[in-house]
Structures are given as C-alpha cells and as structure tokens.
C-alpha cells in the first residue's frame, strides 16, 4: 500500500493495493480500523472522493484488524520523522511486479533524479532489484507468515520502521531501452547457461521454447501433445530445435518429449533468471498463461499462450505494453474436473482439443 494522509475531517490513510483500481481501503488510526474497497467500478474511482460514498461503500478488512495497536499509536505520533521508501516485490506474482512495479521504478531511478530508498520484499524471484542502479539506498524485508497473513506483516513493517510507502501500482509501458537493459542484465548474470544452450542449438532453426506446467492450469496429456507438436514441426523444419522450460514437477512430461526424434534441450528446473537469459535464443514459444509470460514481456517474440477461457484474453494480446508490440496468440482449454473436491478447488486441469 501507499498511504495518503488527510487531516480533515478525521485522520485517515488511503491504502493503494495491487490490483485495479488500486485503492483497496481506508485506515482510521484513531479507531484502529481498516475498511476495504473491492469494487473495480467503485463510484469513488469514477466520480471522486465524496465522504458519504466512502462511508456507504466500505466493509471491514479483517486481516488488517490484527495490526499492533501500540505500534500504530507510535507510528501516528512520530509522523513528522517518517521516511519515504518505494517498495518492490511484496506481491508473489512476478508478472505484476514486472509490468506494474519495475517499469515505473526503472523510469524513476534511471530517468529522473529520484533518490528515495528502495524497500524490497521477499518475492524478488527475478532479482529485479539488482537491475536498478547500485547508487540507490536499499534494504529488504522478509516475512514470517506462520501466525498472520503477509498483508499484516507488511503493515507492521510500515509502522515499526516509521515508513511512508510509495508502491508503484499501475500498468506502465515497458520502454525498449528498459527491455534491452533487462535482457543484457540477465545474460550477464548467467553467461555459462546462455553459452551452453547456444552451443547445443548451433545451426538449429527455428528454435521453439516450450514451457511445461505441472501444478495449477496444467495441460492434461501435456507431454504427449507437445511431443507431437515437436515432431510435426521437425517434419517440416528438419533443423528445428526445442528448449524445455519448467519446474521440476514436470519431469514426466519432459521425459516424454525428450524421447522424440526432435532436437530437444532439457532446461527443466533452471532458475527463473536463467530462463530469462536463455529465452533470447528462442524464435517462438508455447506456454501457459502464467508467470511464464514475463519471458515475453522482457524479450517479445511470436508465440502461443494457452489457458482457460475467462482466465486469459479471448483474442491475441500483448502481455505488457511495449514500444513495438508483439502479440501472443491464444488457445483456450476446457476445464476438466477430477472429482477430488480439495484438488479441483485450487488446481485447474486444462484439456486442449
């Protein structure tokens, strides 16, 4: 959240969150009360800041009611000495981090004289903080979620450290200069992996990146279908090469594809930053609608994104706004229930006809 302070009629903070319309709540320190706004089409967003609309449209946000009352009192009493920091990587989703946080942070820190400190959260799996200038004052926060949810820990980090948080939170275009800087940065971090894959793919064309997924949004029969795809492409383009990407839980599908006669490079289990570095070698891709789309955001190229209708766009789309758009094609799947309610509640198994 980013907290805006208003002294009249009552001291309160507007809490700006992670998803549109960004404003998700109002904190009243005197009452130790947090109210939330969850409607994307809320009249406050469309028509202004009428207090009556605020009062009529709020509901209690239970998690943040667990805030330490003494810490809040101390925070409010010492407001004049609070430090402004910009935040990054407090939300686990790296796609949101990249297109909604980092693009703005990069512009602020490289194109302006912004000297605010950077507070990095526990979810910087792309190590984006390292892609910003070394001169930035910075610190990091880790959370223990064993007792309370991370939003509460986040709020406690604010009050205990005496911070004003500025959280980047809008969809911002990704300049070509920034994309090129990220590409070069990832390759500099992983030169050995890049060189090894490049050597294995010498004289291969086209090179197709295949991202596998074994947990939610997985593709039933993924190994069989992608093996058939690799063999079909190879029949038409004998020098084609394929790079397999994914977490270790896709090993069974990966082995099925590796058993084909196609030229297939096993890159399963690589670090996310290694994948970003080596994605530069691909001419096209096939991947699920997931954090994998950050590969396209950093290094756009033609490809196919698959997922359930309603979860992904209906038409070709751009995962992040760029200066030179490259659209991702879309393939929709059909949800298949397993009959296991606890499994189906959090895993979407997709079957593509």
Regions found by a protein language model. Name each.
Residues 82-87, 203-217:
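Conserved donor-binding/catalytic core segment of Leloir-type glycosyltransferases
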Residues 119-131, 210-272:
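Catalytic donor nucleotide-activated moiety binding site of glycosyltransferases and closely related
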Residues 1-103:
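Phosphate-centric recognition/catalysis
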Residues 275-318:
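A donor-sugar binding/catalytic signature common to diverse glycosyltransferases
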Residues 59-152, 293:
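Active-site and donor-binding regions of nucleotide-sugar-utilizing enzymes
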Residues 83, 207, 241, 283-284:
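Structural motif
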Residues 116-126, 130-207:
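A nucleotide-sugar donor-handling region in carbohydrate enzymes
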Residues 171-188, 316-353:
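Leloir-type glycosyltransferase catalytic cores
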């Amino acid at each position: 959240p980013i907290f805006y302070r208003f002294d009249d009629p009552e001291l309160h903070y507007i809490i700006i969150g992670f998803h549109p319309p960004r404003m998700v709540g109002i904190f009243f320190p005197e009452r130790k009360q947090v109210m939330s706004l969850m409607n994307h089409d809320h009249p406050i967003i469309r028509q202004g800041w009428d207090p009556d609309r605020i009062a009529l449209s709020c509901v209690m946000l239970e998690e943040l009611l667990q805030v330490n009352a003494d810490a809040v009192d101390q925070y409010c009493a010492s407001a004049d000495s609070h430090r402004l920091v910009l935040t990054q990587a407090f939300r686990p989703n790296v796609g949101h981090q990249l297109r909604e946080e980092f693009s703005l942070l990069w512009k602020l820190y490289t194109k302006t004289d912004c000297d605010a400190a950077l507070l990095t959260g526990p979810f910087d799996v792309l190590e984006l903080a390292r892609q910003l200038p070394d001169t930035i004052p910075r610190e990091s926060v880790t959370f223990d979620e064993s007792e309370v949810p991370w939003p509460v820990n986040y709020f406690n980090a604010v009050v205990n450290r005496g911070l004003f948080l500025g959280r980047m939170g809008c969809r911002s275009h990704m300049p070509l200069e920034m994309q090129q800087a990220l590409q070069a940065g990832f390759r500099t971090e992983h030169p050995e992996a890049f060189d090894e894959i490049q050597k294995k793919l010498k004289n291969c064309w086209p090179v197709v990146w295949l991202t596998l997924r074994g947990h939610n949004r997985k593709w039933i029969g993924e190994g069989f279908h992608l093996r058939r795809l690799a063999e079909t492409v190879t029949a038409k383009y004998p020098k084609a090469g394929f790079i397999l990407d994914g977490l270790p839980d896709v090993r069974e599908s990966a082995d099925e594809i590796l058993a084909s006669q196609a030229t297939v490079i096993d890159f399963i289990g690589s670090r996310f930053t290694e994948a970003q570095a080596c994605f530069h070698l691909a001419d096209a891709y096939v991947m699920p609608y997931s954090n994998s789309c950050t590969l396209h955001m950093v290094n756009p190229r033609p490809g196919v994104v698959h997922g359930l209708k309603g979860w992904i766009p209906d038409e070709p789309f751009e995962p992040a706004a760029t200066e030179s758009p490259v659209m991702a094609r879309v393939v929709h799947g059909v949800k298949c229930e397993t009959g296991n309610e606890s499994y189906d509640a959090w895993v979407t198994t997709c079957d593509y006809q």
